[in-house]
Every structure is written in C-alpha cells, then in structure tokens.
Amino acid sequence: MMGVIVMETVLTNEKDERFLELVRELDRGYYERIGDELSKYDQYNEFNKPHVVLLALDSGQPIACASYRVLDEDSVEFKRVYVKKAFRKRGIAYCLIRELEKLVMKDDFSFSIIVTGAHNVPAIRLYEKLGYHMTDDFGQFIGDDSVICMRKEFM
C-alpha cells in the first residue's frame, strides 16, 4: 500500500544539490540497466547550459525532478525527468512536466523536445500521454537507434 505524499514543488536551477543528487541516482540506474554504452551521452548530459528545474518534495525530501534547457528562441528540451522508485506510478512526472510546460508557454516557446531510450516504454507512454509524438532525431542523436526524439507543439 502506498503512503500519503505531502508534495510540494520548488522551482530552482541545475546547481541545486537536491536536483544533482536525484540526477546521480537516475544515472546510476541507467548505468545498471544499460552499462558503459551510456557513457557516450555523458558530455550531452553535463549542465554546461542553464536549466530550469522543478523539484517535487515529500515532507521536505526530494522525490522527483524534471528540467528544461533552451535550445533556441523557439524551442526547449526537457531533460532529467526522474521519480524515485518508491514514488512512481502516482502521476508525479506528469505533473512536473505539465508545470514546466506552463512556464515554457508563458515564455512564448513554440515547441519542446524530449529524448529518451528507444526501449524505455514507460517514459514513451508518459510523453505520448502528455501530447508528444515521435520526431526526427536532432544533434548528436541523428542516426542513434538507441534513443528516440519526441516533440510537442505549443499552440
């Protein structure tokens, strides 16, 4: 039985240690499942550009995160969407992305991109539920069969 979550959200940035700890946990999980092949994305996953980060806290403890970075004047990329295992299947990631999308639309961006593992079915289903659809690969992901790129237009 799942306990009650007393959730609050906090808007922050990529330097927040609570966010960085969740990202380290996310990365450990990826490395356990995928192995060293994942290292080809290390440079891409560095925080060398500012990110807008939304944290979910339960009784003050970080339980989930989602972020985005600006790609250009029209678009953003959602990244580092993660929910701790004990809190999954409760709609938390959905809520975090929706909240970030509100910020993106307020700032007049036209669309967003999300990249995920080609076999990450739960993530793909979540993004489809949020209105994302498959799109052409971009940047370093062109020709990379291990990932898929998804896009959502904001009208």
What does each model-identified segment do?
Residues 7-79, 84-85, 97-99, 103, ...:
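Acetyl-CoA-dependent GNAT
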Residues 17, 90, 121, 144:
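Loop/helix-junction capping segments adjacent to catalytic residues or to phosphate/diphosphate-binding pockets
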Residues 84-90, 118-119:
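Active-site acidic-Proline motif in GNAT/NAT acetyltransferases
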Residues 91, 108, 131:
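Short glycine-rich hinge loops at helix-strand junctions in the catalytic core
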